[in-house]
């Protein structure tokens, strides 16, 4: 275990789900059927190593790190984290930016690169392009040389264009699954379209990957996807992250340092205003990530 003095953490959809208890499945699987199992929320964090366990090999006190807390508790001044859930934070990226990466950027990277097998020149659509996962997905897809279409609401179109989307679709005005355009790869980072709608929007040998959105869409991808995929060349499914690979954190940092991926941060809140941060996130208006700060950057 590594004791981290937390400088910044970020809010994710799972925090809102745990807080509100709106997902019975989540309550059932996390052991918090009647009340949250963990009193302190937060999975993503960035900070400095305060102390290490005797078997820790990769880090030393004073190292700047970022990663996942493993079992919530990141909205705090200190957090013990498994060694394999952390990576070194280079000086080129701020603590706030680093804290915005793990839960959002990892599924975007794995969904596009590994499950989606993205290739240069492909037509890629990101549904939910303005959220935490979506903003990373747009930029990562562009870094692979894809032609990217981002789907979001009216007020967020300009932001999605600004991070590299070649085309944008306002879902309040147009349903992309009912149009003539077909896509080689669709990454669902939001929305509630059915797996059959997504299938319709794919090219003849296209791929659909669910990484975020409604629980119904997740189970459709997980349970129906493999069977639908057996009936033709189209491949459909949900991304299930079973273990962390520190190398993926390194890949994301390299993209950042190359100027190809920049965390989109909507708002910063001090730890004392974490309730307001969660309330704002819950309204669904955030563009990119909402970040909680424990130590001001100028004092870090």
Predicted regions, residues:
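A structural motif shared across PLP-dependent enzymes of the aminotransferase-like
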Residues: 69-83
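Mid-domain Rossmann-like dinucleotide-binding core that forms the NAD(H)/NADP(H) cofactor-binding site
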Residues: 99-170
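Glycine-rich beta-strand-centered segment in the early N-terminal region that forms part
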Residues: 1-10, 24-72, 189
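C-terminal capping/lid region of NAD(P)-dependent oxidoreductase domains
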Residues: 253, 260-267, 275-300
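A short acidic, Gly/Pro-enriched loop at the edge of an enzyme's catalytic core
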Residues: 177-185
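Short glycine-centered segments of the SAM/dcSAM-binding site in methyltransferase folds
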Residues: 64, 123, 206-207
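Glycine-rich phosphate-binding loop and adjacent beta-alpha segment
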Residues: 192-261, 294-300
């Amino acid at each position: 275990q590594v004791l981290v003095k937390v400088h910044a953490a970020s809010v994710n959809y799972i925090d809102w789900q745990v807080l509100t208890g709106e997902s019975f499945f989540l309550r059932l699987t996390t052991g918090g059927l009647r009340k949250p199992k963990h009193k302190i929320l937060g999975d993503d964090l960035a900070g400095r190593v305060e102390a290490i366990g005797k078997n820790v090999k990769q880090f030393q006190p004073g190292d700047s790190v970022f990663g996942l807390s493993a079992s919530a508790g990141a909205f705090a001044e200190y957090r013990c984290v498994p060694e394999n859930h952390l990576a070194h934070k280079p000086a080129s990226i701020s603590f706030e930016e680093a804290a915005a990466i793990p839960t959002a950027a990892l599924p975007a990277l794995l969904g596009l690169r590994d499950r989606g097998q993205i290739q240069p020149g492909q037509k890629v659509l990101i549904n939910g392009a303005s959220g935490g996962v979506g903003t990373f997905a747009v930029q990562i897809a562009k870094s692979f040389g894809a032609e990217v279409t981002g789907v979001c609401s009216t007020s967020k179109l300009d932001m999605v264009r600004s991070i590299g989307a070649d085309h944008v679709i306002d879902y309040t005005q147009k349903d992309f699954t009912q149009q003539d355009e077909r896509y080689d790869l669709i990454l669902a980072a939001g929305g509630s379209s059915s797996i059959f709608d997504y299938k319709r929007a794919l090219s003849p040998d296209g791929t659909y990957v669910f990484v975020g959105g409604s629980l119904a869409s997740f189970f459709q991808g997980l349970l129906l996807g493999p069977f639908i995929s057996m009936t033709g060349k189209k491949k459909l499914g949900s991304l299930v992250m079973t273990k962390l690979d520190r190398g993926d954190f390194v890949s994301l940092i390299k993209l950042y340092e190359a100027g190809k991926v920049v965390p989109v941060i909507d708002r910063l809140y001090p730890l004392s205003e974490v309730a307001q941060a969660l309330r704002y996130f819950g309204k669904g208006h955030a563009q990119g990530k909402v970040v909680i700060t424990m130590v001001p950057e100028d004092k870090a």
